[in-house]
Amino acid sequence: MSSNFKNLYTSNNPPLQATLMRGSKLESIHKIHAVISDKKGRVLMCAGNPEYKSFIRSSLKPFQAIPFLSSGAASEINNASKSIAVACGSHSGSNLHTREAFKILWEYDIDINYLKCPKLIRSPLEHNCSGKHAAFLATCKKLKLPLDSYLKR
């Protein structure tokens, strides 16, 4: 990311920090190095180290949910905000989360066996990515695309 355009609006602040509390107990702390760049990769603004290397993993999920929203698939689901939330993030496989992922499939009359995420204890719905996968399938159904190859598109 190096260029003479670098650091135009760079912050000297440390990385952003998110803390997760479970009741009154601190469960985890996450340091966030954030970068805004132009289409040529020039750093326009950052918090923390703009050169920090990381693996994108689940932080990509909100972007992967864009077709779910832009196709209109999400808006056809009753109380869509919860479905959008489970499509945009990882979850712990709780009943609340698995029900929401299932609701996406139910609303689009999609069999659970189409889910390609690994089957965990009892069901692929318990996988932390099941909401994202359910949203992919709902989008395919909305756009009349094949469900069995949704990961290949």
PLM regions and their residue ranges:
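Short helix/strand-bridging catalytic loops that position acidic/His residues to coordinate divalent metals
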Residues: 47-53, 85-88
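N-terminal, well-ordered alpha-helical segments
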Residues: 32, 62-67, 99-103
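Short helix-loop capping/hinge motifs at secondary-structure junctions, enriched
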Residues: 42-44, 74, 144-146
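Active-site SXXK
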Residues: 56-74
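Beta-lactamase-like hydrolase cores
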Residues: 1-51
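Proline/glycine-anchored alpha-helix kink/cap motifs
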Residues: 35, 66-68, 139
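Phosphate-handling active-site elements
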Residues: 73-81
